[in-house]
A protein has these predicted regions:
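The feature marks non-catalytic terminal segments
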Residues: 116-201
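Active-site beta-strand->loop->alpha-helix modules in alpha/beta enzyme cores, enriched
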Residues: 1-121, 173, 180, 185
Length: 201
């Protein structure tokens, strides 16, 4: 829902993209349904199903208030990096766009991976969370994002969604969540149209 401009940008340029989903989203007991929905959404965005991985770890269950262990996240992410020779990670920032604690936990897991020195040749970038005005300004936020990225001295990148219709179609694959307010979110959210990535130092 948040990363579709980045995914579209990378797949259209033939990057070897892998998606690691650290939970099946079983907070409402619909984990298996949501797993299949994400597979279909990734197919719309041209990510091969064999390059999408889900975890259903007992200590990484989805839900507000269910804080994830950062050391465990670091170990799991580190194993994926090693197993697939990954040299570039894109994740949430420390607010996680929506403020969801699990989004924030993933950021801290990646941050810890970078700081422990075990992965020296890896680069990581975070999806920048914006204030509520920018978040719901739709395509107008492209201009703000471009300005911030230009003034960042190379620490930020602005990725435009060149295929917004695919983002709508991909989100529509999540039929269990495709309710009226999420349709409005996809239409008005700046994250449908542009992603601003910031390098994690």
């Amino acid at each position: 829902m948040f990363f579709s401009p980045t995914i579209s940008y990378l797949t259209s340029r033939k990057y070897n993209l892998r998606i690691l989903c650290l939970s099946i989203g079983d907070a409402d007991g619909k984990g298996n349904v949501r797993k299949e929905e994400l597979y279909r959404a990734c197919a719309v965005l041209k990510v091969p199903v064999q390059q999408v991985k889900f975890l259903d770890h007992p200590d990484l269950q989805d839900g507000f208030g269910k804080v994830w262990n950062h050391s465990l996240l670091t170990r799991i992410i580190g194993e994926e990096v090693t197993n697939h020779d990954i040299d570039f990670i894109i994740t949430f920032d420390n607010y996680g766009v929506s403020g969801h604690c699990n989004h924030c936990d993933v950021y801290h897991g990646v941050r810890r991976l970078l700081s422990d020195g075990s992965q020296k040749d890896i680069e990581a970038w975070e999806l920048v969370s914006t204030n509520i005005v920018r978040k719901y300004s739709g395509p107008l936020d492209i201009w703000f994002s471009y300005l911030y990225a230009t003034l960042s001295g190379g620490e930020m990148r602005c990725l435009l969604n060149e295929h917004t219709q695919k983002s709508f179609l991909a989100m529509a694959q999540h039929s269990s969540q495709w309710v009226w307010f999420r349709k409005l979110f996809v239409a008005f959210s700046s994250y449908t149209y542009v992603n601003t990535l910031r390098k994690i130092n």
